[in-house]
Amino acid sequence: MSYSATAGHSLSSANAGPGILSLQRALLWLAGVACAIVFIEPSPYEIVTLISAVVFIATGLRFRLVFAPLLLLLFLINLGYSICAADLMNQSEVASWIATSWYMAFTVLLLATMTAEDTAARLDMLRRGLIVGAVIASLAGIAGYFHLVPGGHDLLTLYDRARGTFKDPNVLGAFLILPALFALQSVVSDRPGKSIRSAIALAIMALGLLLAFSRAAWGGLILTAAFMFVLMVLTSESRAQRSRIIVTAMVAVAFVAVLLVILLSFDSISDMFKQRASFDQSYDEGRFGRFGRHMLGAQMALDLPFGIGPLQFHRYFPEDTHNSYLNAFMSGGWISGICYPALVFVTVILGFRHIFVRVPWQRPYLAIFSAFLGTVGESFIIDTDHWRHYWLMLGMMWGMFAAAQPYTRHAASRRN
C-alpha cells in the first residue's frame, strides 16, 4: 500500500523525509505489537511509547488547539487522583498506580498528536501491529491452555483460562476485540488473498478469545462486530459493496458457529464455557456482590468529595469496584469522578458525529470507534482504568477528530 498521498495535508509530515516517515510508521507498528505484551512491568508498550515520544518530538510533533479539552480533562482526572493519594504515597503500589495513570494520560496525548498527521498511514501501521500482537498473544494463550509449551501452562493461563501475554484473561479477551474487528473488516472487504490471511488471523484470535472464557469479551465482540457491520453497510458507497459485506458477514457467523460447536465437543472446554456463561456467579450477587458494591460505593461517593484514594476500595468491601466510573470517584474524589466520565462521553458524542464524515481512514475509524464504545460499556462492570489498549483507542479517536477537521469544514461549506 502506498502512503505518499496520505501525508500531504499535514505540514510536518509533508516536510519530513522518507526515512523519517518510515521510522515514525515503524514505531507505531511496534507500539501496536507491544500493546499485546503486558505481563511484565514496565511493559514493552511503555518503553516503545517513550522512544516514540522522543523520536516524534525531535522530528516535529505538533500539539493542536483541538486537543486542549483533552489535555485539560486528563490533567484534572490525574490531579484528583494525586490529591486523594497524597497521604498514601508511602505505599509503593499506590505510588506506582499514580505514576501509571499519569503515563497513560501522556500516551493518550502522544497518540492523538501522532495520528493527527499522516493519519491513514499511521493508523494502518497501528492496525497491522495490533493484529500481529493479537495473534502472538492468542497463540501464547492457546499454547498454554493445551499444554503445548513445556512448563508454560502456569505462565500462560490463570484458573484454567488462557491469558497469553497478559496478567488477566479478561484483559486478553478485551484486547483482542479491536484486532478482531480489523481482521473482520479485511475478511469482508479486501481481495481474496488478503481476506484469507485475515480469516486465519481472525480464527486464531477467536480461539484465543474463547479460551480466555471472558463473558464480557464474548459479548463485547458480538455486539461491537454487529455495530461495526451496520456502520459499514450504512457508509458503503455502492450496493455491490453493501451486498458483499452482508453476505460475507453471514458466512463468517456460520463459520464461527461451526467452530464453536466443534470446540464445545471437548469436555474441558464445554464445562468451563457453561460455568463462565452463567449469569448467577456468586461474586455478582448479594449485598456485597459486584452490583451491590456499585450501589453502596455510589452512596459513599456522594459523601466523600475527596474519595478514599487509589486501591483502597477493597479495604471497605470484599473486592474491587469493577466499575471504572465508580472507581474514578473512589480514587480521585469528585474532581476525577466528574472529569473521567466527561472525557469518555464527550469522546463518544464526537465519535458518533464523525461516523459519516468521508475521510480516507473511515474504515479503521469504524472499527476503532466500535471497539472504544464497547469498552466504554464494559467499564460499567469492570475496571478498565489502566488498560493500555483503552487509552490507545482514546488517543487514536482524538487524533482522527483533529485530522478530520478539514473534511468536516469542506462538507459544511458544500452544504452552504
Segments (PLM) and residue ranges:
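Alpha-helical transmembrane segments of multi-pass inner-membrane proteins
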Residues: 3, 25, 29-32, 124-158, ...
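Membrane-embedded alpha-helical segments of multi-pass membrane proteins
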Residues: 41-59, 98-110, 171-180, 219-226, ...
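Long extracytoplasmic/lumenal interhelical loops at the membrane interface
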Residues: 151, 156, 278-335, 351-356
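Hydrophobic core of alpha-helical transmembrane segments in multi-pass integral membrane proteins
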Residues: 33-35, 49-59, 75-83, 107, ...
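A membrane-periplasm/extracellular boundary helix in multi-pass inner-membrane enzymes
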Residues: 229-280, 295-302
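Transmembrane alpha-helices of multi-pass inner-membrane enzymes
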Residues: 50-56, 225, 368-376, 384-416
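Membrane-interface catalytic loops of GT-C/OST-like multi-pass glycosylation enzymes that act
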Residues: 92, 96, 166-169, 213-217, ...
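Transmembrane signal-anchor hairpin modules in multi-pass inner-membrane enzymes, especially those
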Residues: 1-96, 114-128, 186-196, 357-362, ...
